[in-house]
UniProtKB/Swiss-Prot annotation:
It comes from Rhodospirillum centenum (strain ATCC 51521 / SW). Pfam families: DXP_synthase_N (PF13292), Transket_pyr (PF02779), Transketolase_C (PF02780). Binds 1 Mg(2+) ion per subunit. SMART domains: Transket_pyr (SM00861). GO terms for biological process: 1-deoxy-D-xylulose 5-phosphate biosynthetic process; glyceraldehyde-3-phosphate metabolic process; terpenoid biosynthetic process; thiamine biosynthetic process. InterPro entries: Dxylulose-5-P_synthase, THDP-binding, Transketo_C/PFOR_II, Transketolase-like_Pyr-bd, Transketolase_C, Transketolase_CS. This is 1-deoxy-D-xylulose-5-phosphate synthase.
Amino acid sequence: MMVESKTPLLDTVNTPEDLRKLDPSQLRQFADELRTETINAVSVTGGHLGAGLGVVELTVALHYVFNTPADRLIWDVGHQCYPHKILTGRRDRIRTLRMGGGLSGFTKRAESEYDPFGAGHSSTSISAALGMAVGRDQLGHKNHVICVIGDGSISAGMAYEAMNNAGAMNSRMIVILNDNDMSIAPPVGAMSGYLSRLISSRQYRGLRELGKQVAERLPRPLQEAARRAEEYARGFVTGGTLFEEMGFYYVGPIDGHNLDHLLPVLENIRDDQGTGPVLIHAVTQKGRGYGPAERSADKLHAVSKFDVITGAQAKAKANAPSYTRVFADSLIQEAEADSRVVAITAAMPSGTGLDLFEKRFPDRTYDVGIAEQHAVTFAAGLAAEGLKPFCAIYSTFLQRAYDQVVHDVCIQNLPVRFAIDRAGLVGSDGCTHAGSFDVAYLGCVPNIVIMAAADEAELKHMVATAAAYDHGPIAVRYPRGEGVGLEMPERGQVLEIGKGRIVKEGTKVAILSLGTRLKEALLAAEDLNARGLSTTVADARFAKPIDEALIRRLAQDHEVLITVEEGSIGGFGSYVLHFLAQSGLLDQGLKVRPMVLPDIFQDQDAPAKQYDEAGLNARHIVETALKALGTGLAAETPAARA
């Protein structure tokens, strides 16, 4: 007996070309089936749920009205792209989302022609869309360029830079503001839907243009009065004055879940022959159509595998606290002892653990929104006034504020504390979120101190060290995930700046680890010792300043020195090699082997598999030592595999 499909319409659609064969009256059912498929898929894989559910109707309408992929459709960030992926020939692989060898959790150019621009970080879509629109015009093409950006992402400076530029140009592009927080929109309903359809219509645009031509014949004061009156009237009923002032033709707000509103507005804009940018303001609900996600939009923004009926997430029992939790608890402890400790996050309070800090110290917590550049300089201002700011930002997002780190913090030697979460490889979020580069891009800047926690106890000590350090900027990096299960000290101890530690003594091979590869270094030492190769293991603790006395000792007392780090080329290993070369410690035959992440962008997978692919596990350290000593052959290198 055949089981009746729960998605009969969706089963007939593999690409948007198939979708456009449906009658408009079928689209409501199609959207419901697409939402069901999205929920079922994410329940198996985990991922970003709420954002995608909020744009199901918008996704259907955009692909139905516009001729994708010839018409470019860009999704900002990419959190909301799962329905788009299902609809663009990837349904058969949707249950591989964020897995090794599977679909990326974000849009990705290499994955589909329907992903014209990749994402992962926020607020890039308007800039990319404008570039594509100008490129189209230069080449004499006629396709549309559309980008979808959320009300959170549009608050970032880059989005306003792009809008400011776009408003001064004649290139036609369409920006869809996906407002799922009601932070900008006035109430939506039948009247606003009618006004949006009216304002987007060719007749209205024609009358407006005629009015401008008539006004141009009036004396200049009357021209200005007419312009302001028209803007005031439109702003009164639509709320789009800000975007109009930036040079956009504003349409909205419209109900982003009402296909009867979406379709005619999009068709009107598609068919209009005008020039310049258009902004369509669509109000949506995050988690739409799935009760648990609607009730807890923040908790079901990003989820692990979950039960579709209850929404309960299947989280494995933790063997140790997460590094993020250890950081938060340690910072709370320091703040209880010192009222000058304050915390800054750039729209990631729960991701960085500062939601816990905020519960304890609401008046000492600052969420500045998606504004990493501002966050860093804001922290610099706090430090200049004698406070102790901890700026908690993921490694990958701190890249966005590099000039502020250099110009506003380090040149002025202001004591800003950087808590760099998600350092190293991050698993299912893939290359856009990997924290591979911070040691390299911070280590070349004067005045900054850089620490890397080997385990959760070390992280607690490093938070205490950062709180006590008032001589300039200081950073502590730590990974995503759980600690190693150590007994935690009651209080963090202040570490001596630039001093590492010997963890295991040996005589022939020295392994100098920075960060949480220390556990793998100790496992490698056990293997090497079992082979009769006495091995020292040291924890560098500091990437800058490096412990020159420790490195000198390791170089002079061992035949082989291996550095291991969860970072790119140009980082800690380079600093060690530079010191060894400058000190003449390479002149007596010391064999130095730096082990770093391969010089590639690694795709998503389980973190353990990523590090195995990167060649940074215990067996790789053993192979490196054996090859250096000439007593064994190393396995194929990550670079060769790539």
